[in-house]
């Protein structure tokens, strides 16, 4: 029987000093002996997805205390990728994932906490917390802040029809010379109307949905709107459940509740299957690889490639389809409705554990909104947007009169009526990306699934943006942005502005973009990222010349630099001859702090999840 970790600092004569300090935090004499639950919050006033989390930690803490445990809250950092986008701030986004994981490890281990509640929401926070959960392997539950409501705009002078929109619309229209300042202002003011993570299937919502599929969060975690009063129950239930599973582990020796027992290879395959079926952010590939690495699970790019060939796309939301947003996914039954359709098609491992059900199969049946006996599920998924601008959680209680049960033409479809039988994400291989690169096929127009074009080479995102806005890019070009990988950036910037500006210039279906950097979950179009190995690690993307021909074939999962093997070898030899200047960008003026240089020195390429090269530490 495992012993409560917290006894290290709460029991024994020699811990009198530690107990004195515990008492000073509010621990009473009768509390000693109870499990100590760490509540890792990520509240910040910088991020709309986190601005409403201020009281969430204490909400969970009070419920933990009612259930018979001690709750202690602390905070992690949280970076808003949208605000950090398009300038040097984006260099810090991916590295913050490691800082978040480390900070949770430090706090939990330093204070000998027995279990963990992770209150997350946005892009790097959820994966950072997942990495920490796998590293610590103590009872853990995730509960996120929830998605924001979709924006809505009537149109200039009420002439245009009403349409829903999101952050990406503001970015695209701001760079379109055909859009007036008044129109841009209207979109800007209405794109993000409430607190919560951005309203489409971007990285934040993708990751929160994946925690459901992994089995580490409650049903509705990824789709229940931040503003809805019903979401409060997720936080309260998380507080009760963490105490239950903590006691099951420490008092009943039930190891099935531990993160590594839940997040097995089968669970990672389930999560990736769900992500492919939804056409989620390509960032999820990066993060799942990193989380699996921390969990000691052999889950690689080859597994993702295998799944991408057999999983259909059965749910397509913004930015890939502006008919649907996360609020529509929720109305259609949320993640468990998607999992049900995938299970019916034999695409899931349903014998895996979850924190809230003995098996995933049990959970799918319990949360099936098509079963009239599941009244709790039906009530939960009727939660609707309130349509009122607010930064307050639980501020409205509007409910849909009906659910979206249309599995032929609705938001979530059965496999027979899938948007495409080929999934929403794909891994491409070729001489320009020997260890793979990724593309969100759900966002690629069918007319350009095969594309051959002229390489236009840029050695920084800034130069690429300047080239696009300066009308240097024309139809048929393939924009190559290199030295933006985890090591080369350093920090692996997102390329949302270049892809958005290509759309602004009317080139969204006429050009492609290839990078060793990554993309925002809001990206769509023929945008191929994570080219591995990256240029700074000796990848062939660093050997592309201006004007080269690049051939992209998504159906056959290939990407090819159209030069001979001999020419490629000659270019590599020429690069190596540059000595200390080899595999570094030419003429790039970028300040890189010591903190970022330290990150880059230990970072691996994207095919490994951009995790630290631990071998360097152990030398």
Curated annotation (Swiss-Prot):
Entry-annotated residues carrying N6-carboxylysine:
124
Signal peptide bounds: none
Q: Which GO terms describe its biological process?
A: isoleucine biosynthetic process; L-valine biosynthetic process
List of residues binding [2Fe-2S] cluster: 122, 198
**A UniProt-annotated Pfam family:** ILVD_EDD_N
Annotated Mg(2+) binding sites: 81, 123-124, 494
Where does the source fall among the domains of life?
Answer: Bacteria
User: Membrane: present as a keyword of the record?
Assistant: no
GO cellular component, as recorded = cytosol
Enzyme Commission number(s) of this protein: 4.2.1.9
Report the cofactors: [2Fe-2S] cluster; Mg(2+)
User: Pathway involvement?
Assistant: Amino-acid biosynthesis; L-isoleucine biosynthesis; L-isoleucine from 2-oxobutanoate: step 3/4; Amino-acid biosynthesis; L-valine biosynthesis; L-valine from pyruvate: step 3/4
Task: Enumerate the active-site residues.
Answer: 520
| Disulfide cysteine pairs (residue numbers) | none
Indicate whether Transmembrane helix appears among the record's keywords: no
Recorded GO MF terms = 2 iron, 2 sulfur cluster binding; dihydroxy-acid dehydratase activity; magnesium ion binding
UniProtKB keywords: 2Fe-2S, Amino-acid biosynthesis, Branched-chain amino acid biosynthesis, Iron, Iron-sulfur, Lyase, Magnesium, Metal-binding
Question: Which reaction is this enzyme known to catalyze?
Answer: (2R)-2,3-dihydroxy-3-methylbutanoate = 3-methyl-2-oxobutanoate + H2O; (2R,3R)-2,3-dihydroxy-3-methylpentanoate = (S)-3-methyl-2-oxopentanoate + H2O
Give the cofactor note text. Answer: Binds 1 [2Fe-2S] cluster per subunit. This cluster acts as a Lewis acid cofactor.
Physiological role? Functions in the biosynthesis of branched-chain amino acids. Catalyzes the dehydration of (2R,3R)-2,3-dihydroxy-3-methylpentanoate (2,3-dihydroxy-3-methylvalerate) into 2-oxo-3-methylpentanoate (2-oxo-3-methylvalerate) and of (2R)-2,3-dihydroxy-3-methylbutanoate (2,3-dihydroxyisovalerate) into 2-oxo-3-methylbutanoate (2-oxoisovalerate), the penultimate precursor to L-isoleucine and L-valine, respectively.
Query: Subunit info?
Result: Homodimer.
- Identify its protein family: Belongs to the IlvD/Edd family.
Name-wise, this protein is Dihydroxy-acid dehydratase
The record lists the organism as Neisseria meningitidis serogroup C / serotype 2a (strain ATCC 700532 / DSM 15464 / FAM18)
């Amino acid at each position: 029987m495992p012993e409560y970790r917290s006894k290290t600092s709460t029991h024994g004569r020699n811990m009198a000093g530690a107990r004195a300090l515990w008492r000073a935090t509010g621990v009473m004499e009768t509390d000693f002996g109870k499990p100590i639950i760490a509540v890792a919050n990520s509240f910040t006033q910088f991020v709309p997805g986190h601005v409403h989390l201020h009281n969430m930690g204490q909400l969970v803490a009070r419920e933990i205390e009612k259930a018979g445990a001690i709750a202690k809250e602390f905070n992690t950092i949280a970076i808003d990728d949208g605000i950090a986008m398009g300038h040097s701030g984006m260099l810090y986004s991916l590295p913050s994932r490691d800082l978040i994981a480390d900070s949770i490890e430090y706090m939990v281990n330093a204070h000998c906490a027995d279990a963990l509640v992770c209150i997350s929401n946005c892009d790097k926070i959820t994966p950072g917390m997942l990495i920490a959960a796998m590293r610590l392997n103590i009872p853990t539950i995730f509960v996120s802040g929830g998605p924001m409501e979709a924006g809505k705009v009537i149109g200039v002078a009420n002439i245009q029809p009403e349409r829903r929109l999101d952050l990406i619309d503001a970015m695209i229209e701001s760079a379109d010379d055909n859009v007036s300042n008044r129109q841009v202002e209207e979109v800007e003011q209405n794109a993000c109307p409430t607190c919560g993570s951005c309203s489409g299937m971007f990285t934040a919502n993708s990751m929160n949905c994946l925690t459901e599929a992994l089995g580490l969060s409650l049903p509705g975690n990824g789709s229940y709107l931040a503003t809805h009063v019903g979401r409060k129950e997720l936080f309260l239930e998380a507080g009760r459940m963490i105490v239950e599973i903590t006691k099951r582990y420490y008092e009943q020796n039930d190891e099935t509740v531990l993160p590594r027992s839940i997040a097995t290879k089968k669970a990672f395959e389930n999560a990736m299957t769900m992500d492919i079926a939804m056409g989620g952010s390509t960032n999820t590939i990066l993060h799942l690889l990193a989380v699996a690495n921390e969990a000691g699970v052999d889950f690689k790019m080859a597994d993702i490639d295998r799944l991408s060939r057999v999983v259909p796309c059965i749910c397509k939301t913004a930015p890939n389809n502006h008919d649907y947003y996360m609020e529509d996914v929720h109305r259609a039954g949320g993640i468990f409705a998607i999992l049900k359709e995938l299970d019916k098609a034999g695409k899931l491992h349903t014998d895996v554990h979850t924190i809230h059900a003995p098996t995933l199969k049990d959970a799918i049946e319990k949360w099936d909104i098509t079963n009239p006996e599941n009244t709790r599920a039906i009530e939960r998924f009727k939660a609707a947007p309130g349509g009122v601008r607010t930064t307050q959680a639980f501020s409205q209680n509007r409910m849909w009169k009906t659910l979206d049960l249309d599995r032929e033409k609705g938001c979530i479809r059965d496999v027979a009526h899938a948007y495409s039988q080929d999934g929403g994400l794909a891994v491409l291989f070729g001489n320009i990306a020997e260890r793979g690169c990724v593309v969100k096929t759900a966002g690629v127009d069918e007319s350009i699934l095969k594309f051959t074009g002229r390489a236009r080479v840029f050695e920084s995102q800034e130069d690429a943006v300047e080239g696009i806005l300066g009308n240097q890019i024309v139809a048929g070009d393939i924009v190559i942005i290199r030295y933006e990988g985890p090591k080369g950036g350093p920090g692996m910037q997102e390329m949302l502005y270049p892809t958005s500006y290509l759309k602004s210039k009317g080139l969204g279906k006429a050009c492609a973009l290839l990078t060793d950097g990554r993309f925002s979950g809001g990206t769509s179009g023929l945008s191929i990222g994570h080219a591995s190995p990256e240029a700074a690690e000796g990848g062939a993307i660093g050997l592309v010349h201006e004007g080269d021909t690049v051939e992209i074939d998504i159906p056959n999962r290939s990407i090819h630099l159209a030069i001979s093997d001999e020419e490629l070898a000659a270019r590599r030899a020429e690069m190596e001859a540059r000595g200390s200047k080899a595999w570094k960008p030419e003429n790039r003026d970028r300040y890189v702090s010591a903190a970022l240089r330290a990150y880059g020195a230990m970072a691996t390429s994207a095919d490994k999840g951009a995790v630290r090269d631990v071998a360097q530490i152990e030398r």
